[in-house]
């Protein structure tokens, strides 16, 4: 998964809640005060940035569609996230957000591939066959499968302890653990 991407343009698509930040059980991260980094996530993004030509956050935010928060609230959270990472030299190349409630039949809500395919269309230098989706839920892994069906290939990495039923190409306890494994495969020490 690591060596074959060296020297190529490709994208690492990351879920947000449950991968980068702590998920609010039974609710949504509605504002920056509720955003809580998962341990090691910011360091992991720095390490992954050295490997991945593009990093894009892909997230369902149905709290917008339910009227519990606005699209501006989500943008403010992402702006703060971006500013914190930028202070450490880390750039997120994009945030692809589905604001629709699950009852709506949009093409962008994960596991549908609309958000990823839209980003890939707008970035033709990125090789779709080398894309990787990283997430903590079955819908994230299904997203990778759906992107593969549309684009020809897409690897999946599961974060967290929930069983994927063997659907993921790789599984790690945290984004940090994934980043360390990538670093080791790239010959990094520490």
From Swiss-Prot:
Binding site for substrate: 15-17, 23-28, 59-62, 109-110
Localisation per UniProt entry: Cytoplasm
Residues that hold Zn(2+) according to the record: 98, 100, 106, 108
Catalyzed chemical reaction(s): D-glycero-alpha-D-manno-heptose 1,7-bisphosphate + H2O = D-glycero-alpha-D-manno-heptose 1-phosphate + phosphate
Residues annotated as catalytic: 15, 17
InterPro entries associated with the record: HAD-like_sf, HAD-SF_hydro_IIIA, HAD_sf, Heptose_bisP_phosphatase, Histidinol-phos
Cofactor(s) needed by this chain: Mg(2+); Zn(2+)
Keywords per UniProt: Carbohydrate metabolism, Cytoplasm, Hydrolase, Magnesium, Metal-binding, Zinc
CDD domains reported for this sequence: HAD_HisB-N
GO molecular function terms listed in the Swiss-Prot or TrEMBL record: D-glycero-beta-D-manno-heptose 1,7-bisphosphate 7-phosphatase activity; magnesium ion binding; zinc ion binding
Site-annotated residues for Stabilizes the phosphoryl group: 59, 110
Site note Contributes to substrate recognition, residues: 109
Top-level division of the source organism's lineage: Bacteria
The protein's annotated pathway: Nucleotide-sugar biosynthesis; GDP-D-glycero-alpha-D-manno-heptose biosynthesis; GDP-D-glycero-alpha-D-manno-heptose from D-glycero-alpha-D-manno-heptose 7-phosphate: step 2/3
Binding-site residues, Mg(2+): 15, 17, 136
Cellular component, GO annotation: cytoplasm
Gene Ontology biological process: carbohydrate metabolic process
Family classification: Belongs to the GmhB family.
Subunit structure: Monomer.
Protein name: D-glycero-alpha-D-manno-heptose-1,7-bisphosphate 7-phosphatase
Organism: Mycobacterium bovis (strain ATCC BAA-935 / AF2122/97)
Gene: gmhB
């Amino acid at each position: 998964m690591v060596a074959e991407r060296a020297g190529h343009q490709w994208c690492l698509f990351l879920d947000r809640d449950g991968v980068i930040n702590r998920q609010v059980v039974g609710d949504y991260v509605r504002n920056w005060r509720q955003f809580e980094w998962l341990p090691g996530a910011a360091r992991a993004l720095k390490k992954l940035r050295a490997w991945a030509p593009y990093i894009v956050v892909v997230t369902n935010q149905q709290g917008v569609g339910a009227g519990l928060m606005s699209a501006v609230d989500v943008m403010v959270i992402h702006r703060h996230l971006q500013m914190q990472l930028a202070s450490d030299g880390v750039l997120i190349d994009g945030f692809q957000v589905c604001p629709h409630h699950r009852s709506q039949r949009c093409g962008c809500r994960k596991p549908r591939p609309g958000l990823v395919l839209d980003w890939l269309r707008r970035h033709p230098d990125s090789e779709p066959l080398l894309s990787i989706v990283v997430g903590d839920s079955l819908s994230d892994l299904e997203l990778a499968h759906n992107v593969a069906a549309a684009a020809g290939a897409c690897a999946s990495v599961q974060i967290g302890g929930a069983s994927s039923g063997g659907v993921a190409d790789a599984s790690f306890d945290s984004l940090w653990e994934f980043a360390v494994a990538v670093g080791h495969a790239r010959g990094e020490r520490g």
